[in-house]
A protein has these predicted regions:
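Phosphate/nucleotide-binding beta-alpha loop and adjacent structural elements of enzyme active sites
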Residues: 1-267
Length: 267
């Protein structure tokens, strides 16, 4: 009965424009889904047996690197962090200062982890390089809009947090293209093992640009942040990204019911 009520509520919310169709997605069967990271910073991915020693691009560091650190430690991977936010860059410096040391305290609730919570005893500094740029469709100088809550760390290029306004408080940052990063790290367009996108709305333009250019990571973890503020514009933008991925041969194999999704490229 509970399941029937949930399905009815989901249908009703979609009819009222409160819920996107993707938010009914859960785990597809037949995949080796793994979860790494804190309660706040966790991501789900498919362990397909090819991740040992791989390279990951992780856009949107913030102040919770739990997924990135755990992934780098578990797979001996290089996790390229991409974030120009001042607080994120400061957090990265704190992490590097503790490389080689184990965790001293448990993860805290929320998205601001102390560096002492990370198990860095199996990490080399070369595994966690930081690119201090905003991931975008071109390399330029852009407005990076502040969150509506000053306590939050995440800035946005599209400013969905402030109703897509162009005149709210912002800083200016340099942006970069994913194709330039692939060249810098010597990775072919179809050889990136995993891409994580937590970039506050800019994922729509970035994903469309990637698909247009034939850039095909094996799997993509993406947060469609705009689903946190449901409206027609947000739903249309998420539809654009989902359609671009589907047309390029990706399948959504996991959703957490709110904003986080995992897309896997067809073999």
């Amino acid at each position: 009965m509970g399941s029937l009520k949930r399905r009815f509520k989901s249908w009703r919310d979609r009819k009222r424009g409160r819920r996107h169709r993707l938010q009914d997605m859960r785990a597809a069967p037949g995949f080796n889904l793994m979860t790494l990271g804190s309660d706040y910073g966790a991501w789900v991915f498919h362990d397909d047996g090819t991740l040992q020693g791989c390279t990951v691009f992780s856009a949107g560091l913030g102040e919770d690197a739990s997924f990135d650190v755990e992934f780098a430690s578990r797979y001996g991977a290089r996790v390229v962090l991409i974030d120009p936010t001042p607080r994120a860059m400061a957090h990265h410096r704190e992490i590097l200062a503790r490389v080689g040391q184990g965790a001293e305290v448990p993860y805290v609730n929320g998205g601001c982890q102390p560096a002492t919570a990370y198990a860095l005893d199996k990490i080399d500094v070369r595994q966690l390089p930081l690119e201090p740029f905003a991931l975008w469709t071109q390399a330029t100088r852009l407005r990076f809009f502040l969150p509506s809550n000053a306590e939050h760390v995440s800035h946005s290029l599209v400013n969905f947090q402030n109703d897509y306004r162009k005149d709210s408080d912002h800083i200016e940052v340099d942006s970069c293209r994913i194709d330039d990063l692939l060249v810098r790290y010597g990775i072919a367009p179809d050889e990136l093992a995993l891409l994580k996108l937590d970039i506050e709305g800019a994922e729509v333009e970035v994903l469309e640009d990637m698909m247009d250019k034939g850039i095909r990571p094996r799997q993509i973890c993406v947060e469609f942040d705009e689903l946190n503020k449901p409206c027609r514009t947000a739903f249309e933008r998420v539809d654009r990204a989902d359609r671009a991925l589907n047309d390029a041969g990706y399948r959504c194999i996991y959703g957490n019911g709110t904003t986080d999704y995992l897309y896997l490229r067809d073999a």
